[in-house]
Amino acid sequence: MAGKQLSTKTVVAIGIGAAVFVILGRFVSIPTGIPNTQIETSYAFLALMAVLFGPVAGALIGFIGHLIKDATTFGPWWSWIIVSGVVGLLIGFISNRLKVEEGDFGWKKITLFNAVQAGAQALGWFVIAPVLDIVIYAEPANKVFVQGIVAGISNIITVGVLGTIIIAAYAKTRSKSGSLSKETS
């Protein structure tokens, strides 16, 4: 049985999405005062791409984008790279329920989006990243849990505000299903 292949459109979206993730992560982030922890606008963009292209694209954009960003700075930090992929994956799972390409991103969908993104970020940054930091790098628990909590909270807020705004703006550019009517003479 042949596996489901990614469309050309999705593959291109992954490449462009990873590149934009890198640019935003490198040049449009705000230091928090906690070592190696910034407020990242790249996760709002990741959320948009995951919502538009689904979980596989979201996972790959987060993973590849974060990997390249780290590789061009201080070197790959695998625990956080993995979490970026997990966050993209989990947010992408709701793409079929949101259907923003149909032009509708009302309060129910905004609430669903933010519940899922907050849960994905919390799981990733409050639990997975710190545990992997301890397992992979033998980092001190108190340090990595503080970093994870700060990163998670800032990402939840950034995606909650900026992500919601850009997804809503995108949805407004799409025609609502059934919005056209036939003219009668």
Swiss-Prot record:
One Pfam family per UniProt: ECF-ribofla_trS
Locations listed in the record: Cell membrane
This protein's record includes keyword Amino-acid biosynthesis: no
TM region positions: 11-31, 44-64, 74-94, 118-138, 149-169
A GO CC term attached to the entry: plasma membrane
Database matches in Gene3D superfamilies: 1.10.1760.20
Source organism superkingdom: Bacteria
Keywords linked to the UniProt accession: Cell membrane, Membrane, Transmembrane, Transmembrane helix
Topology class, membrane: Multi-pass membrane protein
HAMAP family assigned: UPF0397
Sequence similarity: Belongs to the UPF0397 family.
Name the UniProt record assigns to this protein: UPF0397 protein BPUM_3679
